[in-house]
C-alpha cells in the first residue's frame, strides 16, 4: 500500500528519472535515507517496476509501426503468443472500442514493413479478421504522472481541463515537430545494444552494475553512454508503476485525423498533462495513448472531437499488457536480421 510520500517520490522520479537519491530527496523535502528505504519498499511491493529507457528506434535502423488488430476474443491468447515470438515486438495490450482485439507496437528493420504485412496477412482468415498499420512521421512526445493533483484520501484527481484546452489556442505552431533522425547503426556494436537492453530493463541501476552485467569496464560504459546521449539514441525514460497505485486511471488510446498544425498543438499540449502519455505524429494526424481518470474521458474526447476531423477511441486492459525489453539477439555483423524466414516463417512455425 502506498501513501502520499510514496506518490511524491514517484512524481519526483517522473521529473528526474535518473536523479540520485540526494536529488530526489531535495525535490521531495525528505531525507536521503528515507528516499532509499521507500524506493526499496516500492520495488519490493511491485508498486514501482522500473525506470525504463524509451529508445529512438530510427537511430537504431528500426522503423516503429503502430498496429491495431481486429480479432475475436477466442483468438487473443494465440495472437499474444505470436507477438511474444516475433523478434521485433516492443509492446502489446488487449483493446476494446473502435478496434477490438490487440494493439501492438513493432520496431522492424528499415524497409521491412512489407514483411510485417506478410506476417499479419498470414493470420487473416484464421486468427485475425483485419489489421491497420501506421508509421510515425516525426519524433514522439511524452508526459509523466504528477500525483500532486491526486487526493489519496478521496481517491480523486483534480485537473483544470479548461485551462489545458485554452493552451491549444496559444500553442506555438511555428516550431516544427522533431524530425525522425537518421540511422547510426553502423556506429554501434553489440556491446552498445546490450547497454540499451539493460537500460530498458532498469535504467536506475548504477553504471558499474550494468557494466558488470554486460562484461565491460565502467569506463567503457561511461564513454558509450556519452555517445548514446549525445546522439539521442535514448528518447526518454518512463517510470513504470503498477496501475493499482491509483485505481482511478485507465489507459485510453486515440487515433486522431487532423491537419499538421493541430498535431503540433496536441503534441505540445500533451506534454503538460499530469498523466502519463505518449503522442506519435502519423500520416493521418497523431496517435495518443494516455492514462487518465475514466470520468475525464468525455472531456478529453470532446476537446479532440472539436479540433480533429475524426477521432477513433479505444481503451486497453492493462492486465494483459506486455512490455518487451530491447533485444540485441536479432543483430549480427552490423545489421538486423531482416529475412522473411526470420520475421514470418520462424514465428509462425513455432505457433501452438
Residue ranges and their predicted role:
Residues 1-352:
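A compositional/biophysical signature of low hydrophobicity enriched in polar/charged and small residues
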